[in-house]
Structures are given as structure tokens and as C-alpha cells.
Amino acid sequence: MSGTLVRMAGPTVVAEGLAGASLNEVVRVGEERLLGEIIRIEGDRATIQVYEETAGLALGEPVEASGEPLAVELGPGLLGSVFDGVQRPLSELAAREGDFLGRGASLPALDRARAWEFEPAVAPGDRVEGGVRLGVARAPGAPDHPVVVPPGVAGRVAEVRAGARRVEEPAVLLEGGATLALLERWPVRRPRPARRRLPPDVPFLTGQRVLDCFFPVSAGGTAVVPGGFGTGKTVLEQSLAKWAAADVVVYVGCGERGNEMSEVLDEFPRLEDPRTGGPLLARTVMIVNTSNMPVAAREASIYTGAAIAEYFRDMGRSVALMIDSTSRWAEALREISARLEEMPGEEGYPTYLASRLARFYERAGRVETLGGAEGAVTMVGAVSPPGGDLSEPVTQCSLRATGALWALSADLAHRRHYPAVDWSVSFTLEGDRLAGWFEREAGDGFGALRDEARKLLQRERELAEVAELVGTESLQDAERLVLESARLLREGFLRQSALDPADATCPPAKAFEMLRLFLEWHRRAGAAIGAGVPLRSILDTGLGARLLRLGQLPAAEVPAAAAALRADLSEALARMEAE
């Protein structure tokens, strides 16, 4: 089916003669065959958002409908690849066309020439259905790639073709003539089905103490990371990609500055994967749509990332989907809505912003797959509120749709406190659900310690306001101890060094032992002050400095170091009380 262009407004164009087209159908626009998607139909007129620069298009140029929705190619070769928002392979296109892509440039997302060794797990006569593993695809220098039956496909195996196969070549033939290849296509806006959702009672461990202990999120949960410029959103997401409990990382750079994304593309291949010792990029899929790339493709990029994440989830893997940032996605939505002349909502964003965000975050979850395995997609969405204003619409809509807020503070970032998570603003809705896991796996009493630590930090904030008025020296020793204990907790527990091999990540058991010792120091020092020991004498023991160095020890050495420090504390306090 084909039509003709009758109206153009930036990336939004209108074509006549497409009466039989459907919503979200992919079209090719103009003589250069620019990629687009139908977003509105009125009679035989279709409104199309074009995923490329539209300058130079002329009225009357042809528009060709494909009959299919916008879809991604899923199969071996995804890991380690870099795509744009509509899954064009940027590395291959750059090699062919240079650093700047021409309009209409296109290549298949997966290499059609590369051969993979297919080792089947099924035999003729077996009945297969969606989610069943057909076998494994292997290639030199690439991780093993499970091949599963796509959702909605079922039948009895008639023939298996093992050995070297390209992604489009049939690997399994079903009775009735249907074929299954290593490659499948899936519409990006349609969530992939699962057998059932599992309860959110297992944490998504990040390796960051402030997140795992104070504001945990479940595997398959959602978190939003708002923060102004320079607060460390990108650095935090890179640390999560490296250290979080995820088998696969899908990183979506949505509308960020080109310089920032080029830095990410330069650093990721050089980051070492702590699991394998190889490059972190080997278990990462990157989707890049910078601020100077077409705005419509930016809107599609997060759906492309979600479809790829769900594909790996269906293999029984834990997937972390990082989006940097949803604010740029919402700005693209606002621009498209304005060109459609829709009624604007708050700050010009479309009135359906909240429902679109909620629908997207609902694609996260820990599930039992169609094949009976357990997989999860955990979403972490960065937000870039103008001026750090958390009351703006994108942040507020994200808060209503997600389970945790990891708010970043510019003040903490300027003080070189990493991660710059503001513990007075951040929260989680999943702490109670995950409390049982932490009590079992980290240590009995973990929840009580966390509550005690947060009360200590809140008390410090109250006393700090008083100290600004009257001076620290005017406070009683017990109040000054609160300030000192909270400082030790902030600098020794909540702050982590991404450059220290032992402190870059922290397992829950190590965090529990550290937190217990910090709070024990505070309680016992408070008891000594109550018995008449001056605070200065306690501080002169140097035990506080030893507390600050606990995080730099490997996890296996922390219990012994904590026991030694606890014994030295008992001896010092006993001596001072006797004096």
C-alpha cells in the first residue's frame, strides 16, 4: 500500500491514500525511504512520526506502508552491540558511511553473514511451544546464546538442522511447514508474555550500601534516579551496570548530550566485568539516541530497550534496564504532541504522560517465563529535572509509577560524597517486603539496625541546624557525639569509593557487620559519656579512624577486623571509666 505526502511539520508528516493502514505500522517516507511509524489515522489520512531528519522532503513524494509494526530483531549477536533508537547497528553503519549517517541509511540489526554453531536440545517428534529451549548458538569470542521458541508458536518438531547456521536460516522445522530460525522479530510496544508474575521478595542487589541497606528495590522492581546536572546519574548507572546482580545490562542513552554518550561508549569497552574478567560490554546491549539525533527515534528508544530486555528475561536471566534519561524521552513526547496539536498538560507535556510512563514501567517484573524458568527485568530510570526541581511533571509522574526514589543531591556531589544519594529525600516502597530476605541472608536484626541508623542521621540534621546558630562548642558532649557518630556513618558507611577494589561493591553480610559496629560504637560511647568520660578522650583513641577504613577491607576480612576493633573499644572505654 502506498500514499503521498500532503503535509509536513518537522518529524511529523501526513500522507493520503493509506486507508487500510493500521496504527503503529512502519512506513517508508519519500524518495529516500526514511523510516517512520503511523501514530494517527483519520479516514485515508495517516499521521506519521519520522525517525530521521525530514529536511528536504517535498509534498507529493511517495509513502509506502510495510504492513508490520515497529519491531526489533532478537537473536545471537545482540550482546556487545551498539544500536540507535530504532535498532540500527551504529558500528556497522559508521564503518560503511563514516561518523555522520546519511538519511535513509539502514542495515539489519543482526549480522546476516555470521555463522553460529547450533547445538539442538530437541529431536524430531518433540512437541514445542513458546518459551521451550530449542538449543544453544555458539560462536568464537561470543557468549553462549540460548535459542527459545517465540511466544505464540507451537507444534511438533519434524526436522532439526544442527551445525553452522546464519540467523535467518531455519534451524528447526515443525510439522505443517513452519520454521524456526535463530532470529525472531518482536513489536517493541507489545510486552512479551510470561506464565505468571512472582512476588517481589528478592532484592536487586546493587553493591551500593546506601541503596541496598536503606532504599532497596526488588528484582524486577523499578527505581527512579532524579538529579540535576553534575550529581552523578551516569556514574551511578555505570556502577550499577558493573556491580549489580544482573546477568545482562541494557543501557539506553535517551537524548543525552553527544559528548556524554561518546564518553560512555569509550569507557564501557574498557570496564572489566568482575564476573568474568572480560570487558563489561560483552554482557551489555547499548541503545544510543543522542540529543542531536531525530527526536521521534528518541521516543521509540526506550521501547526498543524494553523489548530486548524482555527477550533476555525469557531465557531465565536477570536483566537490568538503565534509562538515561526519561526526561529527554518525555521532551520528545512533548514535541510530538505539540506537532499533533494535542491539548497540552502541565508545563506543555501531553496529558497522557503519566499513563505512558506507568504503562512502560509495568513491563518490569520478576516472572516465571513461558518455559518455566525464572527471569526478571529491573528498571532504573534517570530523571533530569530542570534546576533539580523534584516537583516538575516527569519526576512526579515517575514517582507514582515506580517503587523507589534514589534522589541525588548536588550538595553531596560537590562534597565528593559518592554515591550522592540524599537519604533525607529518598525512599522505597519495598523495604518491608524485602526485610525477611535481609534478615535471613545478611544477619538477624538488620531491619532494626537500619531504622536506628536513619534515626541517628535525622537527629544529626536537627542538631546541625542548632549548631549553625549557637556553634558546635556550645552543645553538650552527648549531642556532639551524635554529630560525630553520624559523620562516621556518612563517611565510612554511606560513602563508597568506586576506585577502591574492595569498596566499589559491598555484599549485604559485610554491610551488616559494618553497620552493627558503627552503631555499637555510638551506643557504647554514649554510655561512657553518661558515666562521666569526656568526648575528647573517646575521640583521642583513634578508633573512629579505624571505623572509616572498614569499607576498604575485603568482605572476608571484615568480621576479624570488627572483632579486634570491638575488643579495643571495650578496653579503652573500661580504662577511661576507671580513671
From Swiss-Prot:
GO terms for cellular component: proton-transporting ATP synthase complex. The keyword Nucleotide-binding applies. The keyword Cytoplasm does not apply. Its EC number is 7.1.2.2. It is an enzyme of class 7 (translocase). One of its GO terms (biological process) is proton motive force-driven plasma membrane ATP synthesis. Signal peptide: none annotated. Belongs to the ATPase alpha/beta chains family. This is V-type ATP synthase alpha chain. It comes from Anaeromyxobacter dehalogenans (strain 2CP-C).
